[in-house]
Amino acid sequence: MLATKAKAYWQLTRMNRPIGTLLLLWPTLWSLIIAAKGMPDFDVLVVFILGVVLMRSAGCVINDFADRKVDGHVKRTKQRPLPSGLVSSKEAIVLFLVLAVVSFLLVLTMNPLTIKLSFIGVGLAFIYPFMKRFTHLPQLFLGLAFSWAIPMAWAAQTNELPSIVWFIFVINALWTIAYDTQYAMVDRDDDLKIGIKSTAILFGRFDKLMVGALQLVTLAMLIALGMHYQLGDTFYWALLVSGSLFVYQQHLMRHRDRDLCFQAFLNNNYVGMAVTVGLFITFW
């Protein structure tokens, strides 16, 4: 019984599926590397790596709580712990609060500016899952939530927030909207039946075009970022890899096959990794 419950909690926090953690981690590392112009302070690095894991898990818990009444009607999610009855709603809320509190305790070791920013981060993580009931742009709110670690990390490293931070914030928000639209394309048919909204539904037959446009703007802004910091060739080679991966994702999406759209979404891990490696080598 205990083992079953532990496994259910593990699944509820998506510890068994680290893709979301990685997609949140890469831009956080971009911010830390650029702010530190190389290797960030060790304590800041540890706090943000742990914070990414904990807050992504908290986000998954509150997302499943928000979707508990509809997940049972979606092919991909009907076996999740809440709709299957392995975890109660009360247990999910308690778990979310525990993860959020532990994350906040970590943030308390940082400077006051970072602590203040963390309240907005928790708010974004909490409201995002409910947006899909009210707007076709929940991916925008995910973009904001997944990008908020960027100003937090920069503030923790430097105790300031120059305008370039918000430029990086927008880069990641656009990239997040692109890959979460790919993710939404997987569930589009089910979402239409149960009244859940998404950019995949909003974009309709222009979904692939819009994802491509978002990817193109993301790349263009990354190039502008490199020019701003006068980064070396390694960074641009990394962007060439990222651009090639975007082209590959478009190939996967061409027939809007559910499984292949999901593969396109997963492929974004390598995009984030390429940019991170490029930045690290360049600044190192």
From Swiss-Prot:
GO BP terms in the entry: ubiquinone biosynthetic process
EC numbers on record: 2.5.1.39
Stored CDD domains: PT_UbiA_COQ2
GO molecular function: 4-hydroxybenzoate polyprenyltransferase activity
Stretches that traverse the bilayer: 19-39, 42-62, 93-113, 114-134, 136-156, 161-181, 209-229, 235-252, 264-284
One of the Pfam families matching this protein, by short name: UbiA
Region forming the signal peptide: none
Pathway info: Cofactor biosynthesis; ubiquinone biosynthesis
Cofactor: Mg(2+)
Reactions that this protein is recorded to catalyse: all-trans-octaprenyl diphosphate + 4-hydroxybenzoate = 4-hydroxy-3-(all-trans-octaprenyl)benzoate + diphosphate
Record's keyword terms, sorted: Cell inner membrane, Cell membrane, Magnesium, Membrane, Transferase, Transmembrane, Transmembrane helix, Ubiquinone biosynthesis
Locations listed in the record: Cell inner membrane
Its membrane topology: Multi-pass membrane protein
GO cellular component: plasma membrane
Record's keyword annotation contains Transferase: yes
InterPro entries in the record: HB_polyprenyltransferase-like, Prenyltransferase, UbiA_prenyltransferase, UbiA_sf
Chief location: membrane
Biological function: Catalyzes the prenylation of para-hydroxybenzoate (PHB) with an all-trans polyprenyl group. Mediates the second step in the final reaction sequence of ubiquinone-8 (UQ-8) biosynthesis, which is the condensation of the polyisoprenoid side chain with PHB, generating the first membrane-bound Q intermediate 3-octaprenyl-4-hydroxybenzoate.
UniProt record similarity statement: Belongs to the UbiA prenyltransferase family.
Protein name: 4-hydroxybenzoate octaprenyltransferase
Organism the protein comes from: Vibrio atlanticus (strain LGP32) (Vibrio splendidus (strain Mel32))
Gene of this entry: ubiA
